[in-house]
Amino acid sequence: MANVLVNAPKTAKRGSVVEIKALIMHPMETGFRPGTMGKIIPRNIIERFTATWNGTEIFDMEMSPAIAANPFVSFFAVASESGTVGLRWTGDEGFVVEERVVIAVE
Amino acid sequence: MRALHFGIGLAIIFAASWAAAQVGADKRRSGTQDMGEALQKMQDDDTANPGMLFVQLGSQSWAKKAGTADKSCADCHGNAGTSMKGVAARYPAIPKGAEAPVDLDGRINLCRTENQKAERLPPESRELLALEAYVAHQSRGLPIAPPADPRLDAFRDQGAAIYRARQGQLNLSCAICHDDNAGRKLAGVTIPEAHPTGYPIYRLEWQTLGSLKRRLRNCLVGIRAEPYASEAPEYVMLELFLMDRAKGMVLEAPGVRP
Amino acid sequence: MDRRRFLVGTAAIVVVPLGSASATPEAMAEAIRKVVGDSAVTESRVTLDLPPLIENGNTVPLVVSVESPMTVADHVKAIHVFNEKNPQPNVFSARLSARNGRAAIGTRIKLGDSQKIVAIAETSDGRFWSASADVIVTLAACLEEST
């Protein structure tokens, strides 16, 4: 089950700039750490985080092992029209998580 | 309406200054106060505090049926927002029919085995920590209030004795760091007073949530003492003593700590 | 217990593990070159916000913001963050547009050691802007058994 916390306003004035914050549970294992038996723990990270507004991409971030575990990202978006903000995280080991929030623009 | 607002405003001001006066009288410091502004902000914002991911997971486990009794926590306890409020503030406690105290994870596992007829959740497992975080979160903002159960005294005294006893290759006691040298620096880190106000905590060092037991084990390793076995009664005794020492301090679970 | 024994005892706890793989200032310069090519980079417009003293390098809050009207004609196209001592020089690369309204990104990063962090922004006119910060990472006390 996806374990994500998203913070975005439910309503916004047309043309205003809103902040969207997202937190997701993920180990962001770097691939550089040795495990208990001295063997390197394989890399397991989120490689990409993208956001869309009514299907149009508005933000795209390529991540590296230097992003902390349980990644947090905040960014801004212009509230152009009412709709759905789609958030998508993809990464190693076939990791894909999608989350949606609805923002009503007045 | 305006008068009412004014009255509420005044009440808030009085409450705030009363709280400030209390802080003035009470010299004890939560670990939160020893952290920088960035980490304090991380703890205070529920959508930035990584511990809240575990609280969310715990709320899902709360409603999930488990064991051969096919019962969820909610089937017995209903809404955790009311039934679990204040529970974390009074643990460890002695369960009905038992003679020794258990901590919050011990209590959760008793519910699992006795009521849900399910297997115990392993120590420090994500599911156990999530449930513990969810239950503890219901007491956020409440003062730590150990129960007035005289049967706890002997266990608490043993905890106090452990706290004050030197151990390990470095020959240190808990008290030497956290009473005698609290507020001073250990390398670049401020030594905290060791009040268990935020457990389970999201410790940045761990990059995950962890229990007070795990933190105590880290202390023991730090002074190069042999840590107690993973579910040894000593941890509960120490917790009893620490919770009593922090009596009246406000619970912050899930805390963020470096 | 006297003060000296306390200090001697506790100092021994903080043993610095030596990393094997590590980026270098040269590797960071190379990674930056891949992004900016031969273009000039002006140290302006970009703000890199990090805590002055980092209490644990595993999770360091960071905000990069860039002064920009964020219009279709004049906006920030990309923000990149680099470091010089983690195993790899790249931290993140983000693409933005006028749809963002404000060119600011917050996240949390890992820093293996005290080092220099560089943020580079590319504006829609093809120019590059930067800011850098020297950060001090303190080591946590009382860790667990090495895993």
Q: Where do the protein language model's features map onto the residues?
A:
Chain B
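N-terminal, post-signal-peptide region of Sec/Tat-exported proteins
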Residues: D46-N79
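Non-catalytic, surface-exposed connector residues within folded enzymatic/regulatory domains
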Residues: D70, P122-S125, N171, A232
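The canonical Cys-X-X-Cys-His
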Residues: D70-A80, L131, G159, L170-N181, ...
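Short cysteine/histidine-rich zinc-coordinating motifs and their immediately flanking basic loops
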Residues: M84-Y91, L186-P192
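An amphipathic alpha-helical core segment
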Residues: A175-L209
